[in-house]
């Protein structure tokens, strides 16, 4: 079996919003990597035994006395090191150079003139008509390196940054003031490939097929002949987890699908058809709609709704697990960003942003071991693995759906009537986006039920019914988003269909709020 962890890159996180992008790019190249906090110990680095190290950017200033510093062992480990933005600055300073606050901050596009072609910039040139090779890059910095450490040379400059790139080829230390990990840097992926493959010598073994083989082997080794229980939601993560476990242990996997009454139109039947009929998994379908709706009565605050939905899920799942007396393991679809964001992860720095509705919070007395086959993977990698396992692309590439489901798309108190109306309206919206070839042009689209009524006219009669809002956004990372400029005729068609086909809705509005200041979801 291929050892997919033999060659690996260690990324030290100094707090940049782009740090996870570095890891995703390295994985895209085909090499395993892990993302750790900047204050990792020498012992931890030695234990990880990286083939190369990348120092990320960050919001701090190296001119401040207590700003983060890389562990000294990073520069004594005998492996190549690449510093990006803040990572370059701390490398320069820690090795004897000098950094200062720049008079001219650089944010946005810039053109770097290459002064020397080292191994990092080999065969890179974005402007073939210029007298000297140039790179189109993305800058985001307020400090700059003003004096090189001994052994370094300047390899790139901009009009306002005299040391935009540097290298010490003998020690295989490299620094760039720009961000090669973002798509705005034209040859960024090629630069990272030069470092990871060309300089570090990593082999590209991190592929979907090899990851599946490795995951199946590790599951078999971990659980043996024991039985495993999994909460299957029909989402990407739990679906891929289910198929990996099924491939590894077959009928020893028991999937529990909790139908909470907060799913999309016909979603429960689709899950059963896909995983029960097509893939032959053991699935227990629990119709818990009444239980969830009863618990949610009178609750209108968003976070309270989330917590209630999470608690009821745990209670329902616990009831079902008690019936499976021979189960010894609990499987979860935890993915790598969850690990990074969790306070319990090895980074030790990130705080919990929000908990998933089916992750964590399970009773201690269940005393089950934990199986997390996706723990090392980013979402795009999970999708690739799902495709290789036979899941349809349409399912894997569906827009994000919140853990609490329609519970946070019905504003205020949740009632069955509201959910039923919302399901029908949302299904029409999504259907028309597919028909008009707009579904994959937007990053996320959904309908929100507003607990207000509006006057309408139907034939000769007056109606006083509910209002829904359509929401469609375009985004790269979901940290910021623009509202999607859907064609007016498409919006008109969707509105007419909803008002005419969904009895109980009299008005459709379109949300034109960006993020920020608004969030993508309404609650």
UniProtKB/Swiss-Prot annotation:
Residues where ATP binds: 233-239
GO cellular component: cytosol
Residues at the catalytic site: 85, 179, 181
Gene3D superfamilies in the cross-refs: 3.30.300.10, 3.40.50.880, HUPs (3.40.50.620)
E.C. number: 6.3.5.2
Ranges where the Glutamine amidotransferase type-1 domain occurs: 8-205
Pathway membership, UniProt: Purine metabolism; GMP biosynthesis; GMP from XMP (L-Gln route): step 1/1
Limits of the GMPS ATP-PPase domain: 206-398
Keyword Zinc: no
Keywords noted in UniProt: ATP-binding, Glutamine amidotransferase, GMP biosynthesis, Ligase, Nucleotide-binding, Purine biosynthesis
Gene Ontology molecular function: ATP binding; GMP synthase activity
Catalytic reactions of this protein: XMP + L-glutamine + ATP + H2O = GMP + L-glutamate + AMP + diphosphate + 2 H(+)
Function: Catalyzes the synthesis of GMP from XMP.
Subunit annotation: Homodimer.
Classification via NCBIfam families: guaA_Cterm (TIGR00884), guaA_Nterm (TIGR00888), PRK00074.1 (NF000848)
Stated name of the protein: GMP synthase [glutamine-hydrolyzing]
Lineage: Bacteria, Pseudomonadati, Pseudomonadota, Gammaproteobacteria, Pasteurellales
This protein's encoding gene: guaA
